[in-house]
Every structure is written in C-alpha cells, then in structure tokens.
From Swiss-Prot:
Its EC number is 2.1.1.228. It comes from the Bacteria. It is found in: Cytoplasm. This is tRNA (guanine-N(1)-)-methyltransferase. Pfam families: tRNA_m1G_MT. PANTHER family: TRNA (GUANINE-N(1)-)-METHYLTRANSFERASE (PTHR46417:SF1). One of its GO terms (cellular component) is cytosol. It catalyses: guanosine(37) in tRNA + S-adenosyl-L-methionine = N(1)-methylguanosine(37) in tRNA + S-adenosyl-L-homocysteine + H(+). It is an enzyme of class 2 (transferase). One of its GO terms (molecular function) is tRNA (guanine(37)-N1)-methyltransferase activity. S-adenosyl-L-methionine binds at residues 113, 133-138. The gene is trmD.
Length: 270
C-alpha cells in the first residue's frame, strides 16, 4: 500500500516511523510519503489560509494550494487514482469496518486540514471520504490521520505476526473484546479465570464469547441493535442484563441507601 499525507506540519507525522507502522515500511508492505502543503503556494509568505466568506471566527484553507498539491500527487502513479481521505469532525464515524475497507485500497491520500477546515470546493472536487474519529474537535487532521493509518496498517497482509490477533480484535465481529490476562496466575489476590488455564479450547472460546457479549452490552449496547443472535448468546445477554439491573438494590438496613455491586464482568466465570 502507498499512503500520501498532505499537511502544513510534516513533523507531526514522525510517529509513523515507529512501532507497527514503521516496521510495515521497513518490510516494504507500506510506503508513506509526507508532503508540505506550503510547497504548492505561490506567494512569498507561503499563505495557505484566508478569511471565511460570510464572516465568522478563524480562517479557512484556500483551494489553490490543495488543488495544485493533489493534482501533482495523484499524477505520480500512472493509470491509477488514489482514494482521497479528509479527516474532519463533520465526517462519517470511523469504524473497524471502514478500516477494513480502506485496507483493501492500494493507494490512499490523506488531506490534513487546519483552522476552520478546507474550502468546501476542494472537498467536493477531490475527496472520496470524509472521516471522523470521534465526536470532538482537534486542531487539525494529523492526529486523526495517525489513528486511521495505524488501524489500516495492522490489517495489511503480513503486518501482524499472528493473524488471529486481527480476528480476535474488538469490533472484528461487531463486539467489544473481553478482558485478557497473562502471568502470574494470581496477582494481588485476584486469580486468572480457571477456564483460561484449563486447556479446554471449546470452553475458553465460550468464555471469551460470553465476556465479549457482556462487555458490549454494558459499554456499547448500540452495537447489539438490529442483530440476530444464537440461542446461547441470547441466554448470556439476558443473564448479563438481569445482573446489570440488580447492581443497585435497596440496602438491607434502615434508610434509603443503595448497595452498589461491582461490574457484571467478572474474572471468575467458567
């Protein structure tokens, strides 16, 4: 995969040399090219922004540098057009499914906006995707590009040493991943669930599925909407819902206090 990133702060993308994304580049799986948008300005001040039409605070990124940059970058590979991604809080929410879709592309171009954003005419002309990484506002698109590109890179063939890691990820099957444990078997008085040390792979798979369902119900119930579940899953969800409803019970002593029970996700389920 090739990824081109256009920004006015190229140094912001230095972390892409590290860890998994850096190794993907070393192994030739991923090629990243970072471009300074100011290289396509035409005035002595290398201006990339101007006041917004209609008034209002802040500045808007001018269309001319963006058009010149994207025209030149997209012409560098003959007979191929990249998928152009603009990170923006006004975009479509980024999900694991979106990462999987982008990972199938041979060439991505990321446009990192700043200030109040990029002139809408650039978006209409060039963008294939406007993507939001959450319901909050950042100073620019660079941090979002780091997030998106790492999520995509780990899905590329051969990047992860164990392909099962991808299959077990949160969201890989639409559920959050359950709790994970390693050595020692007992730490600060808390024992690793015995089922995980039993060697019974079917029981372990059932436990992990149960924990994923429970965690998703508690933390992201929206992910369970409009889905069909097997009978075994429905039993787990019903039990988890009942336990969650019982977390706050009237205190057995006089008064109106409540007993708060711990989260229904428990390490001891077998």
């Amino acid at each position: 995969m090739r990824a081109d990133i256009v920004t006015i702060f190229p140094a912001y993308l230095e972390p892409l040399r590290l860890s998994l994304v850096g190794r993907a580049q070393e192994h030739g799986t991923l090629q990243i090219h970072t471009h300074d948008l100011r290289m396509w300005t035409t005035d002595v001040h290398r201006t990339v922004d101007d006041a917004p039409y209609g008034g209002g605070p802040g500045m808007v990124m001018r269309p001319e540098p963006w058009d010149a940059a994207l025209s030149q970058i997209t012409a560098r590979v003959a007979d191929s057009r990249p998928r152009v991604v603009v990170p923006t809080p006004a975009g479509t929410p980024f999900t694991q499914r979106h990462a999987e879709e982008l990972a199938r592309e041979p060439w991505l171009v990321f446009c990192c906006g700043r200030y109040e954003g990029i002139d809408a005419r650039v978006i209409e002309t060039w963008a294939d995707d406007e993507i939001s990484i959450g319901d909050y506002v950042l100073a620019g698109g660079e941090a979002a590009t780091l997030v998106i590109l790492e999520a995509v890179t780990r899905l590329l063939p051969g990047v992860l040493g164990n392909s099962a890691s991808v299959a077990d990820d949160s969201f890989s099957d639409g559920l959050l991943e359950g709790p994970v444990y390693t050595r020692p078997p007992v730490w600060r008085g808390t024992e690793v669930p015995p089922v995980l040390r039993s060697g019974d792979h079917e029981a372990i798979a059932r436990w992990r599925r149960s924990q994923a369902l429970r965690r998703t119900l508690l933390r992201r119930p929206d992910l369970l909407e409009h889905r069909e579940f097997a009978e075994a899953d429905r039993v787990v969800l019903a039990a988890a819902a009942a336990e969650a409803a019982g977390r706050m019970l009237p205190a057995p002593t006089e008064g109106t206090g409540l007993i708060h029970h711990r989260d229904v996700e428990g390490p001891g389920e077998g």
